[in-house]
């Protein structure tokens, strides 16, 4: 099934179906399904689910050594308390799977009010106005529209025009919300005309779909303002100011029927387009593809803990649509090292992350190795390609767009010492 679902389909312009799998620890499972009852009166059984989760994860990890499988994107959901995971068994199992070379995301929360899937996508189950936009775990939420603000261009335009950038940015944010509301009215009109059959059939609930305000160019905007891109008070204040403003307007325009969230978008294509358009317009761009993280992907000065900190609670608290940390490493760590990094993530409040170690694919004999190698260990050919994450999902670097291939070549993969 995963193999077939990862195949290209003509109905999606020859792209694979984007789908997700969520795993739960015992406490997460109990919080979500403790009072759930099936129509026949039976209840979900943790023991059988835990067995199935572990079996599927082990099998899928092995399957990825046989063929290139982009999907599903997997997420391990862990509840945390006092700087560590509550379920020590699943904390150890998560570290074990990372050490065995498996590629998946981990989502951490101190309460089971949310689920995550994909690269930076979360559902909040409680009605508190926070949600990633793809949906997971049977909670029928998602995004019906994403409008992205190019922060670098907005701030540079304001400064060059002699305007205080917070005033100009506030105008842009307000306008984007009004455009989203207009789009929402158009959707309602289409549904009234019977043109949205999936909504009518109940597969998608209009009132639970979010209007997403995307952000891109945050790092580049900070660089333009002369701010160092590392964990420092000036950068923290800048991030809080920008994202806090968007969250304020999300709350202002929110109603019982209209929900907003803010997301640092993956920007697989638009990160390249923004940089290209800005360069042509005479703005400083700093790189050919704008970052989708709170750090510069090519920066060699930041260590692993620095990056967890930059994606920790002090920086992401206003990102109600989320942002994932991609921890790029040259090689896999030990189970004990990964287990310690789970504690670091819990302590720093980095709630969504993955470890990204390029997998080697031989173009001659098609052998797949979970390690980052320059020669095939089977046939010793140097004609190799690499599987890594373009954004949230894994694919061959040779299948990236040309601009993304250049960006991938610049990424810094931290050596393990």
Annotate each language-model stretch with its function.
Residues 3, 151, 156, 208, ...:
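Generic structural "secondary-structure junction" signal
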Residues 101, 214-217, 321-323, 356, ...:
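Glycine-centered flexibility motif
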Residues 363, 378-417:
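Long, charge-rich boundary regions
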């Amino acid at each position: 099934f995963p193999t077939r679902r990862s195949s290209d389909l003509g109905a999606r312009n020859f792209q694979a179906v984007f789908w997700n799998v969520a795993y739960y620890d015992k406490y997460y499972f109990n919080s979500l399904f403790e009072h759930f009852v099936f129509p026949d009166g039976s209840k979900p059984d943790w023991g059988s689910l835990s067995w199935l989760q572990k079996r599927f994860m082990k099998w899928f990890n092995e399957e990825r050594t046989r063929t290139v499988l982009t999907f599903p994107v997997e997420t391990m959901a862990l509840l945390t308390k006092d700087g560590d995971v509550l379920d020590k068994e699943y904390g150890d199992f998560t570290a074990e799977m990372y050490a065995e070379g498996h590629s998946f995301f981990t989502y951490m929360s101190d309460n089971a009010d949310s689920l995550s899937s994909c690269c930076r996508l979360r559902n909040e189950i409680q009605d508190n106005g926070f949600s990633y936009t793809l949906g997971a775990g049977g909670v029928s939420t998602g995004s019906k529209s994403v409008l992205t603000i190019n922060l670098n261009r907005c701030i540079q335009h304001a400064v060059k025009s002699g305007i205080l950038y917070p005033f100009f940015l506030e105008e842009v944010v307000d306008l984007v919300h009004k455009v989203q509301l207009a789009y929402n009215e158009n959707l309602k009109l289409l549904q009234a005309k019977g043109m949205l059959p999936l909504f009518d059939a109940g597969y998608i609930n209009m009132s639970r779909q979010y209007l997403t305000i995307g952000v891109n160019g945050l790092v580049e905007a900070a660089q333009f303002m002369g701010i160092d891109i590392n964990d420092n008070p000036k950068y923290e204040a800048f991030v809080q100011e920008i994202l806090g403003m968007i969250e304020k307007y999300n709350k202002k325009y929110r109603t019982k029927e209209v929900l907003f969230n803010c997301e640092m978008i993956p920007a697989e294509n638009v990160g390249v387009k923004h940089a290209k358009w800005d360069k042509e317009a005479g703005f400083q761009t700093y790189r050919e593809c704008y970052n989708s993280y709170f750090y510069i992907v090519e920066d060699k000065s930041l260590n692993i803990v620095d990056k967890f900190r930059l994606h920790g609670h002090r920086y992401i608290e206003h990102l109600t649509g989320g942002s994932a940390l991609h921890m790029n490493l040259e090689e896999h760590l030990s189970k004990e090292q990964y287990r310690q990094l789970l504690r670091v993530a819990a302590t720093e409040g980095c709630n969504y992350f993955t470890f990204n170690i390029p997998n080697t694919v031989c173009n001659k004999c098609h052998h797949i190795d979970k390690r980052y190698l320059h020669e095939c260990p089977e046939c010793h050919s140097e004609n190799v390609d690499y599987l890594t994450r373009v954004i949230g999902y894994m694919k061959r670097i040779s299948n990236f767009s040309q601009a993304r291939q250049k960006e991938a070549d610049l990424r810094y993969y931290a050596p393990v010492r």
